[in-house]
Amino acid sequence: MKADFMERIDFASAPVSAIERRLLRIADCERRVAAAEAALEHELAPRYSDWADLERIYAAFCNSPHADVTPVERRERFVLIALLLFAPGALLGRSVPRGMGRELSRVLGESKFAVSRCLSSLPLRYRLYMRRKADLWLRDVTERLHNEERGL
């Protein structure tokens, strides 16, 4: 991206102020990207680390309405909640913490196979959903940058 900006500047004929403005804009974009990455790392920090909290969270989850939800959907919803609270990075491709599958299996009262299958399929579906969201966001940001360059 930096090289693309640099190629469009004609250093021989451009006034110094235009070159400086472009370089400042590049530096500002890099600062924003670094800030966004830091915010994402903060968001990916687990909110819980003690597996004992899983039972309390599951009790609260079971007290919420699930009238029209099948047992499989209920399991998927709870596993997604557990991932968001204990290992949000797993939804973006990082590994699930050691022992989480065993504890989920114990709390849910289901087989390790069912829970591990759920743990492996949910992040993929979530990543695909987030990828679509990210593509839309990227398209919007790119369009804004082009409009800014054209002075619109």
Kindly label every feature range from the protein language model:
Residues 126-149:
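Short Lys/Arg-enriched helix C-cap and helix-to-coil transition segments
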Residues 55-70:
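Short, Lys/Arg-enriched N-terminal segment that forms or immediately precedes the first helix
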Residues 110-126:
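Major-groove recognition helix of helix-turn-helix-like DNA-binding domains
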Residues 11, 88-93, 121, 126-128:
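Extended, non-core accessory segments
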Residues 1-58:
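General nucleic-acid-binding
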Residues 93-111:
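Short alpha-helical "recognition helix" segments of helix-turn-helix
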Residues 73-98:
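Short, amphipathic alpha-helical "recognition" segments used to contact nucleic acids or chromatin
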